[in-house]
Curated annotation (Swiss-Prot):
Official protein name in the record: Acidic phospholipase A2 A
UniProt family annotation: Belongs to the phospholipase A2 family. Group II subfamily. D49 sub-subfamily.
Species lineage: Eukaryota, Metazoa, Chordata, Craniata, Vertebrata
EC supergroup of this enzyme: hydrolase
Domain of life: Eukaryota
Length: 124
């Protein structure tokens, strides 16, 4: 679920997903089109693609299980679809953490769809 995604971002990247990633670049936030603008935006692009491959459950609403082991997030549970959602969220949170040094809110916060032409969109 989106609430769990927020939790994973807080645990892994030590940032609020709602504050830092809800309206950034062309792909961080609702929807997405155009070309990812930087490494952080590419994290969101890859996350969107990952959600797009999930079938049989709702990535934004369905609750999955995870645990922390030695500082790492481990996705669990018996439902393969929900586990896949967790893996998408986990990978994005790690990507955000690993690319904090390229995050540029002055340039890409509230970037807007007008700066992300549909015809420049990349396939997943």
């Amino acid at each position: 679920s989106l609430l769990q995604f927020e939790t994973l971002i807080m645990k892994v990247a030590k940032k609020s997903g709602m504050v830092w990633y809800s309206n950034y670049g062309c792909y961080c936030g609702w929807g997405g089109q155009g070309r990812p603008q930087d490494a952080t935006d590419r994290c969101c692009f890859v996350h969107d693609c990952c959600y797009g491959k999930v079938t049989g459950c709702d990535p934004k609403m369905d609750v999955y299980s995870f645990s922390e082991e030695n500082g790492d997030i481990v996705c669990g549970g018996d439902d393969p679809c929900k586990k896949e959602i967790c893996e998408c969220d986990r990978a994005a949170a790690i990507c955000f953490r690993d690319n904090l040094n390229t995050y540029n809110d002055k340039k890409y916060w509230a970037f807007g769809a007008k700066n992300c032409p549909q015809e420049e969109s990349e396939p997943c």
